């Protein structure tokens, strides 16, 4: 296969442009911090809160209990201090005016799910399934919901947040009831999630390596602190397992893809100007202005070495993947009803210096791709022309 024909596969397998930034990769919720950055820097705390809420489920609880591993993973951590995500998240919760969750007017799905354990993991799973109108029943051995997390903050504030996020949802709750017979539970429900906590019973379940949170028992899933991790990882598991349960209820399959771990980004602090971390004037929390000043330190980490080094890519202000799409349309005009001349100028402008390959961490040769594209144009009945650099702009 020629380099031209194989280039799409090369981009998919090697290009790091779409790799998550270090902070997002370290976050148990995979929070879209770059998306939040766009909202924070404009002072759009309502929009930021909605993104935060949709990702973590219980914003007030997470902002107070999360250890924020993203701060240590931040590119600036070893330079002048990582972005203060903890303070920014708490500022989001404090300054957002519209906090009510979305109310979904959906018909009942007619499927029943049992959740064994009323800690954060079980509550997170219940919230997501209730949002989609599944019938959920939570079994909790204690007389209150929340598990260990409830004791890590003011219980009144914890309960208030749970009530706020469930204000438009309904689920059954059996407090003070210990489940001892899992098979009896399976007979009454379409799916079961076991989230009994760090010291909880696992009912002898075996994990299934072919699906996230799946066990070898059909319809039974397991996660949360029972399988390791702190309360934030447990909550993230609960939110994610709801997708695995829904897949099972719809298809009968227990093969939900595993969440991608880590990032392939490789960036250095060379050339980054120092900007000391913003310290709250009151010593505790940011004002809106302080929050906007702090997020301005964000580097919006992404692999853009080729775009920074190549005059051609800077001229067209497009990512390698977008450029590939436009070149493909040009040399395969039948893919669109239009005349397919989108990238003729782009193809003809490159002088094939090879700089893009030199600076790319994966040594992807975009210039060779454009050269092969130019050679392919006559075969596709497209004329390629040479455009000198001084005429390219």
Model segments located where?
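Ferredoxin-type iron-sulfur electron-transfer modules and their immediate structural context
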Residues: 1-107, 112, 164, 189-353, ...
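Short secondary-structure transition/capping segments
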Residues: 149-151, 185-187, 371
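Beta1-alpha1 glycine-rich phosphate/pyrophosphate-binding loop at the start
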Residues: 30-42, 47-50, 82-86, 115-178
């Amino acid at each position: 296969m020629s380099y031209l024909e194989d280039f799409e596969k090369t981009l998919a397998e090697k290009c790091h442009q779409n790799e998550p930034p270090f902070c997002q990769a370290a976050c148990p919720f995979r929070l879209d911090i770059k998306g939040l950055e766009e909202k924070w820097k404009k002072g759009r705390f309502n929009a930021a809160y909605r993104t935060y809420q949709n990702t973590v489920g219980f914003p007030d609880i997470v902002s107070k209990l999360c250890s924020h591993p993203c701060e240590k993973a931040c590119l600036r951590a070893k330079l002048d201090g990582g972005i203060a995500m903890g303070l920014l998240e708490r500022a989001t919760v404090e300054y957002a005016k519209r906090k009510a969750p979305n109310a979904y007017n959906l018909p009942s799905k007619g499927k029943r799910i049992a959740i064994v354990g009323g800690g954060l993991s079980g509550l997170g799973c219940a919230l997501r399934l209730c949002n989609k109108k599944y019938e959920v029943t939570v079994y909790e051995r204690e007389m209150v919901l929340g598990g260990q997390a409830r004791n890590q903050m003011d219980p009144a504030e914890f309960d208030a947040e749970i009530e706020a996020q469930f204000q438009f949802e309904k689920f059954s709750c059996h407090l003070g009831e210990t489940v001892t017979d899992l098979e009896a539970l399976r007979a009454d429900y379409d799916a079961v999630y076991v989230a009994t906590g760090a010291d909880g019973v696992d009912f002898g379940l075996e994990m299934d390596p072919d699906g996230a949170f799946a066990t070898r028992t059909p319809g039974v899933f397991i996660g949360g602190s029972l399988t390791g991790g702190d309360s934030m990882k447990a909550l993230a598991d609960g939110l994610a397992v709801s997708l695995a349960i829904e897949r099972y209820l719809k298809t009968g399959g227990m093969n939900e893809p595993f969440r991608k771990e880590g990032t392939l980004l490789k960036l250095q602090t060379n050339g980054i100007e120092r900007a000391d971390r913003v310290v709250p004037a009151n010593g505790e929390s940011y004002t809106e202005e302080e929050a906007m000043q702090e997020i301005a330190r964000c580097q919006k980490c992404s692999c853009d070495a080729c775009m920074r080094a190549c005059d051609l890519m800077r001229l067209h202000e497009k990512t390698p993947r977008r450029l590939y799409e436009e070149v493909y349309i040009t040399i395969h005009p039948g893919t669109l009803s239009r005349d397919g001349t989108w990238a003729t100028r782009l193809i003809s402008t490159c002088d094939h210096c090879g700089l893009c390959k030199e600076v790319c961490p994966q040594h992807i040769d975009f210039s060779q791709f454009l050269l092969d594209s130019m050679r392919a144009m006559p075969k596709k009945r497209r004329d390629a022309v040479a455009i000198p650099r001084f005429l390219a702009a």
